[in-house]
Amino acid sequence: VLREFRKITDKPIVAVIYSHFHHDHLDGIKGLVSAEQVASGDVAIYAHSTLMHNLVDESAILGPLLGVRAGYSFGFFLKGAEVEDMNAGIGPLPTGGRPGSFIAPSHEVDDYLKVTIAGVELEIFHVPSEAPDELAVWLPNSKILIDTEVLQGPTFPNMHTLRGTKFRDPVRWVDSIDLLRGLNAHYLVPTHGQPVYGEENAEEVLRMTRDGIQYVHDQTVRHMNKGLTPDELVQVVKLPPHLANYAPYLRQYYGTVKQAVRQIYVGYLGWFEGDPVALDPVPEAEKARRLVAIMGGHDKVLQLASRSLEDDDPQWAAELATYLIRIDNDDMPARHIKAEAFRQLGYASMNVNWRNWYLTSAHDLSGTLNAARDAEKMAKVFMPPDIITEIPAGVSIRSWSTRLKSEDTLAVDSSLAFEFSDLD
């Protein structure tokens, strides 16, 4: 990136703005500036006041799991024809798999900051949307709006990521877009996707995106109040033609309406759908055993799953095979059927995240994925040394409790204290 900048300017970098805490928006900082430059004040790094909390909270608590799930989402473990001519839905495929660098911000932004950097007047807005600490940058003198990921580029917004995240509030997202619409930008610059030129075009893209988000939210809530469950909601809530056909910005390349609907339900109500049968269900393996027996036994269900593949019904084939795998996780005939079903679903999917999850899971089922190696590799991506060193000692120690094997310590009653001589 710096090499490309140097083709058009040799001016020094005096400031960096972290748009939000996601790794694709802050990893690699040491390729641009050094920690010594920041410490000396030669370079300023701006970020929202909650960025460090969000970054540490994610890395310290769920870093290992989120690293693996990110690998599935972005297709880091796929090779050859599986990724040939593919992108990430919001831009080129990330290189992935290597620990990034990080420098803690030196300047914090709350709701709004007006600042002049190197003679350029900037206004920085807090615009919670795809991330709770999202910042957008407005250059009033040139009418340029860097909206970061409030607008994710040419795709329906990823209102919930399959990687896993806390609730992304669609109401706040809409409010953030409306705030940016009020600036009447002539140039709209997302951090994913192509820039939008012209005030009318910028307004149209922002308006249609916020309308898409609000429509999905409002209709989901409307039908929730009628008593519909998530499985029922995804069959009912769909974008109307004037939004669904707004290509490419509301095409479901990266986010999908279905996963947005499910996260809205869980965000408002949690996991319980109102049927007490779900309060203490029969364990999955036992339920599978009973259902397979009712359906005629293992061989019969395997035959039905295989026939479903032949009949171009890969989803049903995968669901049938799943019952057999829950009974015996090493049932390779069932695993191969489910893997083939996932390949068919993956290659047919327009959404890149769904595609990558299907194809990567097919490798897992077939035994061609080195889960332990890849988990370790991706954990280092989500928890690189630069971030680990920024985790406060108290937070780090607190996170250790989630690693405790409680079954091995039920008879232990002791206290453990740590004293850090090198901390204030």
For every predicted segment, state its role.
Residues 1, 53-226:
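Metallo-beta-lactamase
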Residues 1-16, 58-62, 66-68, 312-314, ...:
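Pre-active-site segment of Zn-dependent metallo-hydrolases
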Residues 2-45, 108:
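Active-site metal-binding motif and surrounding structural segment of the metallo-beta-lactamase
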Residues 5, 20, 45, 109, ...:
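Divalent metal-coordination and catalytic microenvironments
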Residues 13-22, 46-48, 145-148, 187-192:
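Active-site neighborhood of phospho(di)ester-bond hydrolases with catalytic His/Asp-centered motifs
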Residues 202-203, 207-208, 216-334, 340-341, ...:
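Hard-cation-handling environments
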Residues 286-287, 300, 304-319, 323-330, ...:
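Feature captures hydrophobic
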